[in-house]
Amino acid sequence: MFTGIVEEVGTIKSINRGQHSAVLTVRAKTVLEGTRIGDSIAVNGICLTVRQLFPDSFAADVMHETLNRSALAQLTIASAVNLERAMPANGRFGGHIVAGHVDGVGRIANIRKDDTAIWYTIHADSAILRYVVEKGSITIDGISLTVAAVEPTGFSVSTIPHTVRQTNLNQRHKGDFVNLETDVVGKYIERLLPSETPKQNTLTKEMLLRCGF
């Protein structure tokens, strides 16, 4: 589990693409501290398992499903990526619950600056937007952010300059694709609630006759 508080911005050192998967090697520093093979690191919000460690980087496998569902396939050498190690049991919970399982991809439709904040408007599919609520949490490329407004085709977030400086948001432009993970709590609530679809009536004339009516 992660919190959406980015520890550092790494860079893609190499990408080895296979027919149905890829191996990413990411140049990093902070997230290598105490990390062992088999540990989890979120790369742009996607939970990846460390398969190899080097003095200045780590390598991780990316499966076919992840490549299809996320924006990782668009990474190139030297691309900046947000990195976060899995939260330890005694760690501080600074953001919100982030599983590292991306729901899909959004696209930056607009970037606007005002006196104190930078606003990002993200367009996304309706399947993602159904879980996006105003004042709720959302993860954009591994960054825990608060939804400022929800629109029919997307949503907006307001970020402080510190967040932009400490993440790869400072290298994002209009038209860029970003990984999105909605709040997992909403998904569980939806799953537990009774379905709104009425159950099919199984009472038939033949059944009534068999029962003596």
Q: Residue locations for each model-derived region?
A:
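Conserved loop->alpha-helix
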Residues: M1-F213
